[in-house]
């Protein structure tokens, strides 16, 4: 069955809803054409501090190579399970509206889409990232989703559109997250654990350090659950360069 079309976006210039399939247009006639790879550029030029914001093309390529090799498979499966467990659509027969803020090249989204397909649950997935090379890859790899180049701190997403918001290792834009989530919506916030990539740090640094882990209260949000995902992987020499290059 072909998925129903959906448009999660609002105009980044005036905030009005965007409508359309390939060409998006708002009520004030601002228009945005879909790139050939299947994404929209919804980051206004005046909001770009550099010519190519976000992760570089080289970093994106390295991350894609490493993730596609399956080393983070345990994490991808856990994300799918969490989204199935915590995602609740607004209506009984409605698809889940899932928004990935800081989607990167979309590997996590593909894991989630696979989990929903296997569970027979409908999902409408949208994601954005400030790095155009990453969004280009995400859109090509998962055509059923909607992707845009955009900033977390000025999200071109309709107010209250998201049932479930995913934020993996990306900046926490508290006010915008609260705006785009519907009342009663939920967020999955992923942060690195204390020993995330610790073995790699032990190779790189004379005095390796653990990531600080602390409880942080975010206004408008309350914790309803926590899950720690851990595992040990063996990375062959040929993939070490990709692991180093993908890490900021």
Predicted segment positions?
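C-terminal helical/coil "lid" or tail adjacent to the Rossmann-like core of SAM-dependent
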Residues: 233-248
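A short acidic, Gly/Pro-enriched loop at the edge of an enzyme's catalytic core
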Residues: 153-164
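Class I SAM-dependent methyltransferase Rossmann-like catalytic core
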Residues: 49, 54-78, 82
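Conserved beta-strand signature within the Rossmann-like core of class I S-adenosyl-L-methionine
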Residues: 184-192
